[in-house]
């Protein structure tokens, strides 16, 4: 067996800086060199393998196994989810009901500062709570484009909106996982999320309005945006404190915020109606509104997304035990070890690394979306031939972006199995009493590398808890800070960027989306970091 070495250069800070080269390289490739996401991923993977093997001593066979593991996890479940989500969207468009979708949104408000809150913030928050894995980013970005938003701007707004709900995605898995890894009570950690994160959740709608329309937007609809954020965040606080449940934190509050916002819009509209430059003009929208749609037609138009919501919620809750390893349908899950990695690596703490791949054919979220797509085909005017034609178009649209996702996951796995990610975290952990200031940065790095708040918590929740005990800070605070920093990292994680780009048919434009989004991710990270440090001084 090979044991990970976290300080191969006998200088913790220098070793960490070398370990961070892939993260820095990926960002520079996208933002400075303006390379496509695919080229950036290839370059970063090559450099990561060289550093992992030559500097950190990762055996070549383990490096190959890490890449294999990355490709498998990138293809399934992530690639499968993206493929099915985009196919469902294309089926919905091909079915010919999108004029009704647009009209139904415009009937609530023609102001696109509010439309983005309805779709990306509220509806997207609910989808994140039910499914996660980038599904709300893909679906909401595509819906915004259908309303006339610029594709790249729609992607950025969907990514930023996702920061409000990313901590509790897929029925609260990031928090429940963090509690398990850090040996904390789940209800206690859920309550601990409140002071760390929820002031920032409340201001996300304000940020989205400011991005669209600057100070004028804040003056005209800022109060409504803030109220939406407070209801969303306040609902999450209520669920976390009184129910002690992170599982429902992205289910009830987004729907509550959506209903309240729609009710407000039924009684009030801004004097100045904001339209995106690329969207249909107000006159064109009003002309379209002259065509009356019945309630049945509106439900029919939205039915693909209703089916999506129902199926992913069922897959995540009621049906989940059926797909478990010991469940009636567990036989549909094939699990096998990753050669060169499984039980071939020992961590610095002496723990043997297990690395397996589980092909959960029935229980995957992508399969839930497949069911929603099949129901849509059966209940709409689209023929099977047209549906399969759309699938072919979807595959041609996604094959390169899915390859990029596989490469990104390979980078993450090489860094993890080589001990590079842990090297960065351990170096930051030497900051002593200043560590709470850097705690969210570790979560940010974890999500940037892995693309998942859950994975970042698997990697670092234990480190955060241990370091907290050493410096006399409540472990709950730092584990919560790790999660909070992670959701800010999701805004620019290569995996999320790739999903957003492909959803709006802008594959190859990842560098532009990253450049547009990174400043907001950085600002939110700085705010969370300073706030976490202040909390550590106040409550310890």
Where are these regions (language model features)?
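Transmembrane helical segments that form the transport core of multi-pass membrane transport proteins
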Residues: 291-446
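Hydrophobic mid-bilayer segments of alpha-helices in multi-pass membrane transport proteins
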Residues: 18-28, 35-56, 79-85, 225, ...
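Juxtamembrane helix-boundary/capping and inter-helix hinge elements in multi-pass membrane proteins
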Residues: 35, 93-98, 110-111, 144-153, ...
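Active-site loops and adjacent core secondary-structure elements that bind or stabilize anionic groups
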Residues: 237-329, 348
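Juxtamembrane and boundary regions of transmembrane helices in multi-pass small-molecule transporters
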Residues: 167, 171-280, 484-540
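Membrane-embedded alpha-helical segments and adjacent helix-loop junctions characteristic
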Residues: 64-73, 78-147, 156, 381-467
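Structural signature of hydrophobic alpha-helical transmembrane segments
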Residues: 7-21, 74-78, 130-136, 187-202, ...
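Alpha-helical transmembrane segments of multi-pass membrane proteins
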Residues: 113-125, 151-164, 187-205, 406-407, ...
């Amino acid at each position: 067996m090979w044991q990970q070495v976290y300080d191969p250069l006998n200088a913790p800070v220098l070793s960490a800086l070398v370990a961070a080269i892939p993260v820095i390289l990926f960002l520079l490739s996208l933002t400075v060199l303006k390379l496509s996401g695919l080229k950036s991923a290839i370059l970063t993977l090559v450099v990561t393998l060289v550093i992992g093997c030559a500097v950190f001593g990762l055996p070549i066979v383990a490096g190959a196994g890490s890449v294999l593991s990355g490709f498998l996890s990138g293809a399934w479940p992530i690639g499968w989810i993206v493929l099915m989500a985009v196919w469902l969207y294309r089926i919905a468009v091909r079915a010919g009901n999108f004029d009704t979708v647009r009209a139904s949104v415009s009937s609530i408000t023609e102001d696109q500062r509010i439309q983005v809150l309805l779709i990306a913030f509220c509806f997207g928050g609910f989808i994140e709570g039910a499914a996660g894995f980038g599904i709300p980013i893909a679906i909401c970005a595509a819906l915004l484009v259908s309303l006339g938003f610029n594709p790249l701007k729609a992607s950025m707004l969907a990514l930023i909106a996702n920061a409000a709900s990313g901590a509790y995605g897929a029925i609260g898995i990031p928090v429940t996982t963090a509690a398990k890894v850090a040996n904390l009570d789940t209800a206690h950690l859920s309550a601990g999320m409140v002071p760390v994160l929820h002031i920032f959740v409340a201001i996300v709608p304000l940020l989205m309005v400011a991005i669209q329309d600057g100070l004028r937007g804040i003056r005209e609809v800022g109060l409504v945006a803030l109220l939406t954020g407070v209801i969303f965040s306040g609902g999450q606080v209520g669920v976390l404190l009184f129910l002690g449940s992170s599982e429902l934190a992205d289910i009830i509050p987004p729907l509550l915020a959506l209903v309240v916002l729609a009710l407000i819009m039924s009684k009030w509209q801004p004097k100045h109606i904001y339209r995106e430059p690329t969207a249909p003009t107000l006159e064109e929208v009003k002309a379209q509104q002259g065509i009356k749609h019945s309630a049945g037609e509106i439900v029919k138009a939205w039915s693909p997304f209703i089916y999506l919501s129902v199926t992913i919620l069922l897959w995540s809750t009621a049906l989940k035990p059926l797909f478990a390893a010991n469940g009636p349908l567990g036989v549909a899950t094939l699990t096998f070890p990753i050669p060169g990695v499984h039980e071939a690596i020992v961590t610095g703490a002496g723990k043997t690394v297990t690395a397996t791949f589980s092909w959960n054919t029935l229980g995957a979220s992508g399969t839930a979306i497949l069911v929603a797509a099949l129901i849509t085909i059966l209940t709409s005017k689209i023929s099977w031939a047209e549906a399969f034609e759309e699938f072919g178009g979807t595959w041609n649209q996604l094959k390169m972006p899915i390859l990029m996702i596989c490469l990104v996951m390979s980078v993450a796995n090489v860094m993890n199995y080589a001990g590079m990610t842990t090297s960065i975290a351990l170096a930051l952990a030497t900051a002593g009493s200043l560590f709470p200031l850097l705690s969210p940065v570790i979560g940010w790095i974890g999500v940037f590398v892995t693309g998942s708040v859950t994975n970042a918590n698997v990697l670092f929740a234990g480190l955060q808890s241990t370091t907290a005990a050493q410096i006399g800070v409540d472990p709950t605070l730092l584990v919560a800070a790790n999660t909070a920093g992670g959701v800010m990292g999701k805004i620019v994680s290569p995996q999320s960027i790739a999903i957003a780009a492909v959803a709006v048919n802008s594959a190859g434009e990842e560098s532009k989306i990253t450049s547009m989004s990174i400043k907001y991710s950085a600002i939110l990270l700085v705010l969370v970091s300073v706030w976490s440090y202040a909390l550590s001084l106040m409550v310890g």
